[in-house]
């Protein structure tokens, strides 16, 4: 069992080097694969001897035991990547994960905010304080660009061009994209860079665009906490909140105003159009609600 766990660590190291996956993803893979190794060990199996039927039984057992479909899908992804790696490294002569059936995932619509709610959220920070001026600029950039939370906290000074009005983003899989900022975001970035950021840095030299109060790179958890703080001030229902609430609003509002789906896909940094298409369902649902509220025969 120790040898199998060691191979998992080798695999995760290789995955980090090749794919530049987030630490949270790697830790989730580590937990899932360690659980799988223990499950195999109790059945007298190892990574070298496990067969497709064994892996399928593991997935089925997880689902029947109350595992969420999304968790099972993540487990399947980890298992597939691991055995592809073992096959590529010639530890195995076959890949038993090649034909595993995927669990059916329920289609969940992203939590979205109305344009009026977003406006209230953006107006919540008190811009006469450097810290809240930073937060105002962050919220404006999030809504203007649709960036992921992890992408925003990773931005550096060299990633933005206020003259050109664009931001350079390094997204999932280390893929780079340029996203327009828009006039409002550019204005608040300029204001923050002049009146907010120098106060936050207090003489510390750091390239991070949005530093923490301690002049370090902000964590995703801190940003999420700040979003929730302003949402409460704006009177927004907590059930409508998620770390990517402004990303979802960005996509939905663009589609509501007639944006092309593939343009939205490019701006969001989605590799698969089907990932973007879920926002069309949000827009359609919004239209249906408006129809029911205002049409005399609805």
From Swiss-Prot:
<dbReference type="GO" id="GO:0005737">
    <property type="term" value="C:cytoplasm"/>
</dbReference>
<dbReference type="InterPro" id="IPR002104">
    <property type="entry name" value="Integrase_catalytic"/>
</dbReference>
<dbReference type="GO" id="GO:0007059">
    <property type="term" value="P:chromosome segregation"/>
</dbReference>
<dbReference type="GO" id="GO:0006313">
    <property type="term" value="P:DNA transposition"/>
</dbReference>
<feature type="active site">
    <location>
        <position position="247"/>
    </location>
</feature>
<keyword id="KW-0229">DNA integration</keyword>
<dbReference type="GO" id="GO:0009037">
    <property type="term" value="F:tyrosine-based site-specific recombinase activity"/>
</dbReference>
<dbReference type="InterPro" id="IPR010998">
    <property type="entry name" value="Integrase_recombinase_N"/>
</dbReference>
<feature type="active site">
    <location>
        <position position="148"/>
    </location>
</feature>
<dbReference type="InterPro" id="IPR023009">
    <property type="entry name" value="Tyrosine_recombinase_XerC/XerD"/>
</dbReference>
<dbReference type="GO" id="GO:0003677">
    <property type="term" value="F:DNA binding"/>
</dbReference>
<feature type="active site">
    <location>
        <position position="244"/>
    </location>
</feature>
<dbReference type="InterPro" id="IPR050090">
    <property type="entry name" value="Tyrosine_recombinase_XerCD"/>
</dbReference>
<feature type="domain" description="Tyr recombinase">
    <location>
        <begin position="108"/>
        <end position="292"/>
    </location>
</feature>
<feature type="active site" description="O-(3'-phospho-DNA)-tyrosine intermediate">
    <location>
        <position position="279"/>
    </location>
</feature>
<comment type="subunit">
    <text>Forms a cyclic heterotetrameric complex composed of two molecules of XerC and two molecules of XerD, in which XerC interacts with XerD via its C-terminal region, XerD interacts with XerC via its C-terminal region and so on.</text>
</comment>
<feature type="active site">
    <location>
        <position position="270"/>
    </location>
</feature>
<keyword id="KW-0238">DNA-binding</keyword>
<dbReference type="InterPro" id="IPR013762">
    <property type="entry name" value="Integrase-like_cat_sf"/>
</dbReference>
<keyword id="KW-0131">Cell cycle</keyword>
<feature type="active site">
    <location>
        <position position="172"/>
    </location>
</feature>
<comment type="function">
    <text>Site-specific tyrosine recombinase, which acts by catalyzing the cutting and rejoining of the recombining DNA molecules. Binds cooperatively to specific DNA consensus sequences that are separated from XerC binding sites by a short central region, forming the heterotetrameric XerC-XerD complex that recombines DNA substrates. The complex is essential to convert dimers of the bacterial chromosome into monomers to permit their segregation at cell division. It also contributes to the segregational stability of plasmids. In the complex XerD specifically exchanges the bottom DNA strands.</text>
</comment>
<dbReference type="InterPro" id="IPR004107">
    <property type="entry name" value="Integrase_SAM-like_N"/>
</dbReference>
<keyword id="KW-0233">DNA recombination</keyword>
<dbReference type="Pfam" id="PF02899">
    <property type="entry name" value="Phage_int_SAM_1"/>
</dbReference>
<keyword id="KW-0132">Cell division</keyword>
<protein>
    <recommendedName>
        <fullName>Tyrosine recombinase XerD</fullName>
    </recommendedName>
</protein>
<dbReference type="GO" id="GO:0051301">
    <property type="term" value="P:cell division"/>
</dbReference>
<comment type="similarity">
    <text>Belongs to the 'phage' integrase family. XerD subfamily.</text>
</comment>
<dbReference type="InterPro" id="IPR044068">
    <property type="entry name" value="CB"/>
</dbReference>
<dbReference type="InterPro" id="IPR011932">
    <property type="entry name" value="Recomb_XerD"/>
</dbReference>
<keyword id="KW-0159">Chromosome partition</keyword>
<dbReference type="Pfam" id="PF00589">
    <property type="entry name" value="Phage_integrase"/>
</dbReference>
<feature type="domain" description="Core-binding (CB)">
    <location>
        <begin position="2"/>
        <end position="87"/>
    </location>
</feature>
<keyword id="KW-0963">Cytoplasm</keyword>
<dbReference type="InterPro" id="IPR011010">
    <property type="entry name" value="DNA_brk_join_enz"/>
</dbReference>
